[in-house]
């Protein structure tokens, strides 16, 4: 059944973009993913990433799939967090081009899930301050923090197993960092849905 599904989806993708698609998992199709997805799907996507990381790191998820995907309240709900706040520092990484900035910051590599009040408190912070907010939250969020990698042998093994050398702490977050995170998510999604 998987072969039939892959065949049909590649045919549909080819028709839609007017270009032959060889595989349903091509980075060119994933590169700009984010803005075009509804919020619940984004939460589902990151819940699956979180579950994959937890399994690979031989630990339990910090939140359940149900909580990550369905809870939306201001106290216990999970919300989309933009790593790049809408401020002058973030905009400067895009040479002041606000349209480009808004497109880029909404890609999957530029967002995470944060619990209600954490998300509200980090809303317009500078990136260096956001890193503190990400401590102790979800595993995917913590991969931005350098201290997450210290003495974390399971994570080192995970990076080697999936050839994710670029997955490392980021003391600054700019356009290149966002692209790196997008590529990492593509590799992880390819593993989850392969």
Q: Could you tell me what each predicted segment is?
A:
Residues 102-107, 111-194:
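Long, cytosolic, alpha-helical-rich C-terminal regions that act as interaction/scaffolding modules
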Residues 1-104, 108, 113-114:
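Intrinsically disordered, low-complexity N-proximal targeting/linker segments that flank membranes
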């Amino acid at each position: 059944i998987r072969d039939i599904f892959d065949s049909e989806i590649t045919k549909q993708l080819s028709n839609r973009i007017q270009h032959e698609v060889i595989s349903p998992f091509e980075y060119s199709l994933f590169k700009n993913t984010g803005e075009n997805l509804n919020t619940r799907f984004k939460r589902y996507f990151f819940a699956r990433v979180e579950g994959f990381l937890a399994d690979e790191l031989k630990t339990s998820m910090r939140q359940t799939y149900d909580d990550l995907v369905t809870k939306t309240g201001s106290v216990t709900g999970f919300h989309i967090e933009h790593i790049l706040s809408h401020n002058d520092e973030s905009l400067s990484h895009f040479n002041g081009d606000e349209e480009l900035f808004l497109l880029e910051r909404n890609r999957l590599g530029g967002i995470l899930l944060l619990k209600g009040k954490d998300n509200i408190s980090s809303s317009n912070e500078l990136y260096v301050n956001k890193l503190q907010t990400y401590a102790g939250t979800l595993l995917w969020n913590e991969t931005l923090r350098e201290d997450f990698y210290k003495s974390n042998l399971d994570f080192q093994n995970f990076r080697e197993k999936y050839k994710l050398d670029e997955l490392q702490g980021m003391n600054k977050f700019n356009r290149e960092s966002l692209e790196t995170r997008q590529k990492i998510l593509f590799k992880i999604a390819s593993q989850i849905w392969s």
